[in-house]
């Protein structure tokens, strides 16, 4: 069985989209866990008659703690954490993942399709480059070429929890720990769709530049003895400075 955790916050329509993408799958042995930080009862009421494990946080936990609370509830052998603004695009998404796991992989990375207004962007980079970054996951600290959390599926035995000291690069640091020293495969035919630009999007509510600096300093200290991570952070900083000079 695979557990799909859906953290939610005050957006019933996006939650419906995420949930419907799960129940339309050809693989039906799925545990759906909804961890709700909402200030309204809309999602709670909608879930009353659904075959889901629903938990409402009162008071709200905040984004990262809410994600961790969902991970702790998972009972499946495999896990996906899918935010309410994400969805599984292809109906064989889960069965394709399970095939990879049966072939001995520990982590499966899927492709990403970003929706922003009327525009759609498929993929973040060439597939060969994504495979390179996945094979050497410390490179993700230079740039996120994976996408959102739903692009990662993993065996529960290798579960990692989000570092609650982080905000902006919390997902990247989590990806690194999940993939480091594991057998990872990129499934380019599996697609996650991600809705950007909506009011509740976490990145819309952060001072990104300031938070990125705070997170980078924290990671630099956390990985004091990891030269690859530290070098990746240095390269990211160098590239950012070059881009500013060009502009």
Q: What are these model-predicted stretches?
A:
Residues 57-74:
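Glycine-rich, basic loop-to-helix element that forms the pyrophosphate-binding segment
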């Amino acid at each position: 069985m695979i557990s799909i955790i859906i953290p939610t916050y005050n957006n019933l329509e996006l939650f419906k989209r995420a949930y419907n993408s799960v129940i339309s799958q050809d693989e039906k042995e799925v545990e759906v866990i909804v961890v709700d930080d909402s200030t309204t009862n809309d999602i709670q009421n909608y879930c009353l008659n659904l075959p889901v494990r629903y938990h409402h946080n009162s008071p709200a936990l905040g984004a990262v703690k809410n994600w961790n609370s969902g991970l702790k509830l998972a009972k499946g052998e495999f896990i996906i954490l899918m935010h309410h603004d994400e969805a599984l695009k292809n109906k064989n998404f889960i069965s394709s993942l399970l095939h990879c796991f049966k072939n001995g992989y520990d982590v499966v990375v899927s492709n990403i399709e970003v929706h922003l207004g009327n525009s759609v962007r498929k993929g973040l980079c060439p597939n060969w480059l994504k495979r390179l970054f996945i094979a050497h996951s410390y490179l993700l600290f230079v740039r996120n070429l994976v996408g959102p959390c739903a692009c990662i599926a993993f065996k529960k035995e290798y579960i990692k929890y989000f570092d609650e000291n982080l905000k902006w690069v919390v997902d990247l640091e989590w990806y690194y720990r999940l993939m480091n020293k594991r057998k990872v495969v990129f499934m380019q035919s599996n697609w996650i769709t991600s809705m950007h630009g909506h009011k509740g999007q976490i990145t819309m509510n952060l001072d990104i530049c300031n938070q990125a600096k705070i997170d980078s300093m924290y990671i630099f200290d956390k990985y004091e003895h990891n030269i690859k991570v530290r070098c990746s952070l240095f390269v990211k900083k160098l590239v950012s400075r070059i881009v500013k000079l060009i502009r």
